[in-house]
Amino acid sequence: MQEFDPMNRGFASYRSPRTIALVGKYHSLEIAESLRRLAEYLYERGVSVFIERETAEHIGKIVDLSRWVTCGFNDIGAHADLAIVLGGDGTMLNAARRLARYCVPLVGVNQGRLGFMTDIARDDMLTCMDDLLDGRFAPENRMLLAAEVTRDGKEVASNMALNDVVVDKGAIGRMIEFELFIDGEFIYNLRSDGLIVSTPTGSTAYSMSAGGPILNPTLTGIALVPLCPHALSNRPIIVNDNTDIELRIVNADDPRVHFDGQVTLDLERGDCVRLRRSEHTICFLHPPGYSYFAMLRQKLQWSERPKGP
C-alpha cells in the first residue's frame, strides 16, 4: 500500500491502508480502553486489525480483545500496511527497530509524557483516523544507525537504533577511555563518561540533555556528543551520514553499549563498536498540519511566558 522511493531510501507516499496493526505500551494498562476503542473504530471502517502479541497478552487482561488476530512483529511486517503505536517515544523506538526491515510505516498516538515521535493526542485519536484511512497523512522517512560489536576480530553482537547508540562507563564511577576513528582516520583519544552517537531523530533525546545540537530529521548527519569529557575541548561534532564510525575501548572497568536506551550489552577492554547509517529507514506518517518546529515549540515550551502567582 506504500510507494517505495529508492533514491530517498524510504516511502514517497502511501495509500489507504486495508490492514493495520496496533502496538501498545506493554506495561501500561491505562491504554487498554483506548486500544479497544481504536480497534473497534477501524473494524467498523472495514479495516483488518492485528494486535501485537505482547500487547494483547497484557491489555487482554483488562479488555476483551479476542475478536482480533494477535501476531508477532514478524507477521506484522509481512502483512500489515502500517502500524499504529499507542504509548510514548519508548514504545515507538521499540516498534521502529522491530519493523524497519519490513518497511512498515508507523503512526504514533501519545499515551506518554513529551512524545516527540507520537503526534496524535489520545483525545484526538479517533477524529484523526479518517484522514489516515483516506491517505491524507504525510510520510517522513527517518534514518537509523546500524552497529556491530567485534571482539578479537569476531562479531559478537549487532543491532539498530533510531535515536542513538551510547557507549559509556557503566556502573563504575571511573571514566571510560576509547579511541575514535572516522572512515579509518584517527580523530582523538577520549576520556569521559561516554559518547552518544545520535541520529537527527535522537537529537532531542539524550543527546540534547548532554549539550548536543538539535538536528532537523530531514538532515543526513550523525552527531557525536561526549558525555562529561575530561578535556573541555572535546565538543559535539556532526559528521556525514555515509561515515563509518569506530570506537575502540582502551581502558574501562565496566564499559557498556546501549541501543536506544532499551537494549544493553556489556563490553570488554579491546572491543570495537562500529557504526554506520543503516540500510533500513523507518517511515513516520504525520497528520495534516504537522510541523516539526511547532512540535518543538510545544514540547520544549519555547516562548512560554512565566505564569504569575
Curated annotation (Swiss-Prot):
Catalytic activity of the protein: NAD(+) + ATP = ADP + NADP(+) + H(+)
Compartments, record wording: Cytoplasm
Mainly localized where? cytoplasm
Which cofactors are named for this entry?
A: a divalent metal cation
Catalytic residues, per the record, are: 89 (proton acceptor)
What does the entry list under GO cellular component?
A: cytoplasm
Enzyme's top EC category: transferase
**Mind listing the GO biological process terms from this record?**
NAD metabolic process; NADP biosynthetic process
* Keyword terms: ATP-binding, Cytoplasm, Kinase, NAD, NADP, Nucleotide-binding, Transferase
One of the entry's Gene Ontology molecular-function terms is: NAD+ kinase activity
What is one Pfam family matched by this protein? NAD_kinase
Question: What's its EC?
Answer: 2.7.1.23
Q: Which residues does NAD(+) bind?
A: 89-90, 163-164, 174, 191, 193, 204-209, 262
Chain's role = Involved in the regulation of the intracellular balance of NAD and NADP, and is a key enzyme in the biosynthesis of NADP. Catalyzes specifically the phosphorylation on 2'-hydroxyl of the adenosine moiety of NAD to yield NADP.
Checking HAMAP family in the record gives: NAD_kinase
What does the similarity note say? Belongs to the NAD kinase family.
Q: What is the protein name stated in its UniProt record?
A: NAD kinase
- In which organism is this protein found? Dechloromonas aromatica (strain RCB)
